[in-house]
Amino acid sequence: MKILVINAGSSSCKYQLLEMDTHAVLCSGLAERIGQDEGRLTHKIAPDTDKEEKIVQTAHFPTHVQAMEMVIALLTDAEKGVIKDKSEIAGIGHRVLHGGEAVSDPVLVDERVKGIVRECAVLGPLHNPANLMGIEVAEKLFPGVPNVAVFDTEFGMGMPKEAFMYALPYELYEDLRIRRYGFHGTSHKYIAGATAKYLGKPLSELRSITMHLGNGSSMSCVRNGKCFDTSMGLTPLEGLIMGTRCGSIDPAIVPFVMEKKGLTPEQVDTLMNKKSGLLGLCGHTDMRDVHAEVEKGNERAALALKMLVRSIKKTLGSYYFLLDGKVDALVFTAGIGENDDIVRAEVCAGLENLGIKIDAKENGTRKAGARAISTPDSSIPVLIIPTNEELQIAMATVEVLGK
């Protein structure tokens, strides 16, 4: 069974075609600059294998339809194609940012589901309209092929009410559904399953803490295989310090800055989402640049690193106690989590008092695949597990189609 996974943005579209019998990625790619004078399509055949072949094409893509038509042409190309006809695709899985409280599982797309995506655009104004566009383009170009929506907020629907409610007037929840939703849910769900598999433990018994650390970062507390708490909130702004996002701050800062700087709500939103975090502290968003500046003696870069690590450790500690100290694994994933040994070492520094011990050599070694970086006598295994959101979406699509 072949599943196409689509992640549509406002001016871009990521895709991946998987053979689900083996979980092999047949091809993947990115169409970008859609709607601009010159678009670009980067297409990889057998990505991340010794047979990888890269094709780059430029063209004018007035809309996502033209971009996806070029993708289909590459998929079915007589010489370079990975399928003979688009009818070989059994289903299409779509990443959708926000489903609100209306959906708690991946769902087969119909008019009701598209209506939910539209309604939740107020909570995901940058992503939901683009995600819906991706669905409608797929319906147009792949008639008769079922589409499945996989929501980034799905995993957070498993939280108990005391975890997702804010201590605001209750009518704000009733009227506006203001609550914690959590994001990176597809990644956290995949990592929960992969962690259980790595440990040889039933998912229904798993108690773990997942650290999805990248330009956008979040953490998830997993109890009995489900989300028990998570760091992001109503929006992806809450929680950890990130590349350009401030993370959790005193809410009173917002009206204070608006008054003192004469800013509009939109300007403050931009300031907190796109001009804060590591960028606001030291002028860099890439951790490699931050580390390089720390080596040069840049005090603001050193401060940014310390604040980032501190925000992770504070959340880690709270989740440890939410799990009553009974934790099966601490798991690092995503760009920083998988590749930054300095951040991992700093996050785990001092945890020896809880019996959690890191193997410095193993932590500093780059390896592919899931692995432990803790010592054999560590009280809790510390793991690196590469995330795979596309595979999780594809597996969810297969599950929905099988119902």
Curated annotation (Swiss-Prot):
GO-annotated cellular components: cytoplasm
The family this protein is said to belong to: Belongs to the acetokinase family.
PROSITE patterns referenced in this protein's UniProt entry, alphabetically: ACETATE_KINASE_1
EC number per UniProt: 2.7.2.1
ATP-binding is among the record's keywords: yes
Subcellular location: Cytoplasm
Cofactor: Mg(2+); Mn(2+)
Pathway where it operates: Metabolic intermediate biosynthesis; acetyl-CoA biosynthesis; acetyl-CoA from acetate: step 1/2
Residue(s) at site: Transition state stabilizer: 184, 245
Pfam families assigned: Acetate_kinase
Catalysed reactions listed for this entry: acetate + ATP = acetyl phosphate + ADP
Cofactor note (record): Mg(2+). Can also accept Mn(2+).
Official protein name in the record: Acetate kinase
Membrane-spanning segments: none
Organism of derivation: Desulfovibrio desulfuricans (strain ATCC 27774 / DSM 6949 / MB)
Main subcellular location of this protein, as a coarse class: cytoplasm
Gene encoding the protein: ackA
GO biological process, one term: acetyl-CoA biosynthetic process
Binding site for Mg(2+): 7, 389
